[in-house]
Amino acid sequence: MVRGARKAIAVGVAVAVACGLQKHLNFVPGPRHAAPVAAAAASMMMAPAAFADEIGDAAKKLGDASYSFAKEVDWNNGIFLQAPGKFQPLEALKAIDKMIEMGAAADPKLLKDAAEAHHKAIGSISGPNGVTSRADWDAVNAAIGRVVASVPKAKVMAVYDSVTAITDPGVPAYMKSLVNGPDAEKAYQGFLEFKDVVEKNQVATASAPAVVPSGDKIGEAAKALSDASYPFIKDIDWLSDIYLKPLPGKTAPETLKAIDKMIVMGAKMDGNLLKAAAEAHHKAIGSIDATGVTSAADYEAVNAAIGRLVASVPKTTVMDVYNSMAGVVDSSVPNNLFSKVNPLDAVAAAKGFYTFKDVVEASQR
């Protein structure tokens, strides 16, 4: 259940931070000595500002080595939505959990910077393959490098190992076959040099856990929402592959505009509350049952964390996300999902959500 739309708001920006590097690393074989930064390919995060120049310089060198390759990648290809091997959602969730843990350990300021770099890069996308400008390519890689350097190596390695466990060994060779081989190899060598600079600047200890608010109106409203909607949550097939399907009738560039609004929203979120939401999701993953449903208590905690996150963002920014998503989600999508659950449970959940929304809006800055 933690893969639903609410999670997208809570940690979607953190996932987006990694998307750029993730896709251009898909061709690499994945030796363990490359792991500290390779993990970022599937995750999120950052590093101390004191390292900005060194990592920034290294990112420019990486750009020299990899931009030709980047222009060859079809960034609009639906393959990036697919599982990197056998579809096994509960195993994949273990890898996602490691990414969330890594994200929670990251420096919130650098996460914000990385999100803003991605937003800018989306603005310079051009050409049939959907590639960003060279300057923005470098800026995104530098931002991701700083993200990774702000997380202890052990947490980065945990992501690397968990993603390796669910990735078919034939994936790297297949991805390499879609581009010019020599350009891919040159990009990979540049990546190895970049990861050495990032690892050199990596922190040894994680940041402190988030301070979680308590006794607030959003927390109380989250309990009411959870009581009203938990039966509906248990009706949902969280192990379905429907969540990997592209939105019907929409192209990748059209969908990316909505994702961009999410990134902008994420960049404006309170850093402590974002960390708290990631930690709540991590705990919720730990209590899921065989059907993918978390405990009632953890479900409530996740709802409260997301409500506080949304309240930390101006209403206009939240509405930008709502309107952009409404523009790319066909009416057949909610109708199809509604048909798969108990309608009375769905209606009760919707009523609970509307009440919760009002409390969040009243608390919004």
From Swiss-Prot:
Site positions (Chlorophyll a binding): 118, 281
MF annotations from Gene Ontology: chlorophyll binding
Annotated transit peptide: 1-52
Sequence repeat ranges per the UniProt record: 53-215, 216-365
Secretion signal, residue range per the UniProt entry: none
Subcellular location: Plastid, Chloroplast
Complexes and interactors: Monomer.
Domain notes per entry: The mature protein is composed of 2 almost identical repeat units.
Function: Water-soluble antenna for capture of solar energy in the blue-green range. Peridinin is an asymmetric carotenoid.
Protein name: Peridinin-chlorophyll a-binding protein, chloroplastic
Species in which this protein is naturally found: Symbiodinium sp.
